[in-house]
Structures are given as C-alpha cells and as structure tokens.
Amino acid sequence: MHVDIPAEQTAEASVRGGATLIITGVNHSAMKPRDLSIEEKRRLFDRLAGLLSNREEILFAYVYGSFLHGPFRDIDIGIFLQADSSGAAEPLRYEVVLEQELEDAMGVPIDVRVLNAAPLPFAFSVLQTGEVLVSRDEKARCDFVCRIYTHYHDFAYYRKRYRREALGLLR
C-alpha cells in the first residue's frame, strides 16, 4: 500500500529482516475539529466496533481521547492483539496499515496504538479514560487491566520520588 504524503510528514523505521517501513501520517492537529452529536458519534463508534470485531487477531480495543468528550480531529484507538499474530510481532507496521484501512472505511482520521507492549503510563491512561470498543476475550482484557493497574500503582512511589528528585525537592 502506498499513500502520497509530503516528505516532512514521513519517518522511517527499521523492521525485522532489515526492511524499512515508511511511516506516513497526517498532522491531525492541523485539521479542523469535528463537532458531532452524540447520535453521530454513536454511529461512528458502532461502525468502528463492527469493523474491528471482524479481525480475529484483535482480542479487545478501546476508544480514548477527544472523540469521547467533545470536538475531535481523529479517533484514538488502543488495541490488544493475540500474542501469536503478526501485528504483535511488528506493532508499528500493523498500526500504520490498520489506520489506513479504518480511515478508508470510516472517512475519519484514525490513530491506532497496539497496547501489548505499550509504555505503562500510556496503557494506564487508555484504560483510565477510554471506553471498551470491542472485547472478544473478556478474560484477556481483565487480565490486562489488572496487570496494568497493579504495575502502575506498584510503580507510583518510585515515579513520585523520581519527580521530586528531578525537581531537587529531595535531599
């Protein structure tokens, strides 16, 4: 798949096997925010859930970000993949391809992030502020939620201490 994007909006990433993946993206912050009614958002939500439900590699997905709270420029989606899927092995490639497929189908900019190996603060934020879009495996979803919440709160002391130390508040 190829999409023509200005050079300043592209980046390269090495992937397994020495190949290079060209990551293209649109600066969504430059787009005008969409302000849809609750009913229009619900229709988009349901269409998106239907599209993701057909993908067996996706165990569960969350919508998070501005789409849930007001005007939005894109729809942010966090997905958790089966461990043996190619997307879990190459999350960056999977994100780019799925974003394009969903944008083509929905007509709305989509931002996809694979949660399997996402940084702890990011995963916690998605779970804390997001809404379940699809859940094909409730046990896997609940295990993930418990693991992220446990690790996040276990690490909170060290995160707070580090911040205080970085600001020079500890002696």
Regions found by a protein language model. Name each.
Residues 2, 8-60, 68-71, 82-171:
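Catalytic core of pol beta-like nucleotidyltransferases
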